[in-house]
Amino acid sequence: MAMVKRINNLPTVKLAKQALPLLANPKLVNKAIDVVPLVVQGGRKLSKAAKRLLGAYGGNISYTEGAKPGAISAPVAISRRVAGMKPRFVRSEGSVKIVHREFIASVLPSSDLTVNNGDVNIGKYRVNPSNNALFTWLQGQAQLYDMYRFTRLRITYIPTTGSTSTGRVSLLWDRDSQDPLPIDRAAISSYAHSADSAPWAENVLVVPCDNTWRYMNDTNAVDRKLVDFGQFLFATYSGAGSTAHGDLYVEYAVEFKDPQPIAGMVCMFDRLVSLSEVGSTIKGVNYIADRDVITTGGNIGVNINIPGTYLVTIVLNATSIGPLTFTGNSKLVGNSLNLTSSGASALTFTLNSTGVPNSSDSSFSVGTVVALTRVRMTITRCSPETAYLA
């Protein structure tokens, strides 16, 4: 039988329902329907039993096409409470298992298709415990071991915007961490593992784990598929405004084995400017990539798009340099030190980055650089207390 729903919970409704079995005159039933409008959901016709109950009169009955299975209603005042989670350690013979949840990034709205908040680096969110961009806390544990495997992994989107926000938020997982980023919505719809929702709706992407042991991040690896468990991507489109849609969290259960000497939390960067904008030597933790360092136009700009506090030392082989500025997603902590001698300048400072990419300004920049030939830089993750420069 098609489901019949009365619109208004009026006293006349209850009275009519109680009187229907007792009424002998169909005309009185029809009169009751005149004051009790009905809506049939699902767009289906009434069954014979329903017609016999309601009589021949049907002028006050309307048919509406209801929401299809899986549809989500826009909430009016519903929010999610996100409590802190203590990491759980489970020890077994030869390995240790960690269960935890971490914050990844805030999702920014965009009218056109934008992937990873506009960060164009391939493999930014590589699924590897040593990847600081995806596992801010876990990276400190991962550097103590040589191999890992995920037994549970899922990405959760928690909205912070209202139900009037427009657009879509897509969560994606690509098994190949070296695949290029999707450039259109057709590419997004082709992913085997994806989840798409409105910006005001919660969303979860469950990643299928294969129970395979892999090596930690190795900067010398030719094929990253041997060390990475794919890559995570997120995309937004058809949105408006500048307020973040929501936050992304990663929930995981990961096992480590084969302890090794501590790998460190330092990134080393070296570029001969006379060669090109790419092809630089980068070792250690992937706080930055080639594209994040701009050395053209007489200025140097560096983008650190991973949240955290960092101690930075940059050495510039140049005749002279201009001031150090922070106009992007970072701010200076304390003061900076500057030393110039024999055609080279060294700057040391501490910065705090929000991790949200800024398409207009770099995290920090050095202006008016004359006759630049080489850029060397070390970036160390730290805390303001241990890296503060008075």
From Swiss-Prot:
Disulphide bridges, residue numbers: none
Cofactor(s) it depends on: Ca(2+)
Superkingdom field: Viruses
Cofactor detail note: Binds 4 Ca(2+) ions per icosahedral asymmetric unit, itself composed of three capsid protein subunits. Ca(2+) ions probably promote virus assembly and stabilize the virus particle.
Location in the cell: Virion
Cellular component terms per the entry's GO annotation: T=3 icosahedral viral capsid
GO MF term list: RNA binding; structural molecule activity
Coiled-coil boundaries: none
PROSITE patterns assigned to the protein according to its UniProt record, in alphabetical order: ICOSAH_VIR_COAT_S
Main location: virion
Keywords from the UniProt entry: Calcium, Capsid protein, RNA-binding, T=3 icosahedral capsid protein, Virion
InterPro entries attached to this UniProt entry: Capsid_prot_S-dom_vir, Viral_coat
Region (P domain, projecting): 257-390
Region named S domain, virion shell: 95-256
Complex formation: Homodimer. Homomultimer.
Family: Belongs to the icosahedral plant coat protein family.
Task of the protein: Capsid protein self-assembles to form an icosahedral capsid with a T=3 symmetry, about 32-35 nm in diameter, and consisting of 180 capsid proteins. Also acts as a suppressor of RNA-mediated gene silencing, also known as post-transcriptional gene silencing (PTGS), a mechanism of plant viral defense that limits the accumulation of viral RNAs.
Protein name (record): Capsid protein
Annotated organism of origin: Melon necrotic spot virus (MNSV)
Lineage: Viruses, Riboviria, Orthornavirae, Kitrinoviricota, Tolucaviricetes
